[in-house]
Amino acid sequence: MGSAAAHRGDTTQAVRHDRANHLWLERIVRSQRDGLSCLPFHLGLDERSYAELIRTHFPELAGQTSASLGSLAHECSELREDLLEMRRDEWEELRVLLLDGRRGDDPEELWMASIVAAACLGGDHLWRDLGLESRETLRVLLMHNFPHLAERNVKNMRWKKFFYKQLCEQDGGYVCRSPSCEQCPSHHDCFGAEI
């Protein structure tokens, strides 16, 4: 887990790399291990998928468990795993939404959909809940993996708000009371700067 780009925090341009997802996954795993994301130890993946991801990208971490990170990190990870399990239906809806918009040519998109869906359940901006360095990095990651969904965010809505709005519109319901985003008194909550 030691590429120069990831150490510089430069995964925004990773899409040019032959293995773009590797750099993003490296950042996500490192952030989770350092307690800088909302993700549980398995990143929202089932044990088999997680083991495959680690074996494929980070074999040096193959024997690591959440318990090996220390008692506090282990406890936090277990709590995050429990919270994810309580919201499994919501996670699945988000995962399906992402997969419906996937590029379709990379099996790693399955992993990324599960990870992004798990991070959507966190309480901060999505890029922070994933442990990424910026909203722009998240945008590039989403455009790379889920372009058919990400390109619909033409008004630059915050990603979590955008995903949940897409789910509401799919089901024929609307969370918002305003007839349009432009007339909404909470416009800044959905479209304001993420700092």
From Swiss-Prot:
Keywords: Molybdenum, Nitrogen fixation. Coiled coil: none annotated. Pfam families: NifQ. InterPro entries: NifQ. One of its GO terms (molecular function) is molybdenum ion binding. It comes from the Bacteria. Transmembrane segments: none annotated. GO terms for biological process: nitrogen fixation. The keyword Translocase does not apply. Probably involved in molybdenum processing. Belongs to the NifQ family. This is Protein NifQ. It comes from Azotobacter vinelandii. The gene is nifQ.
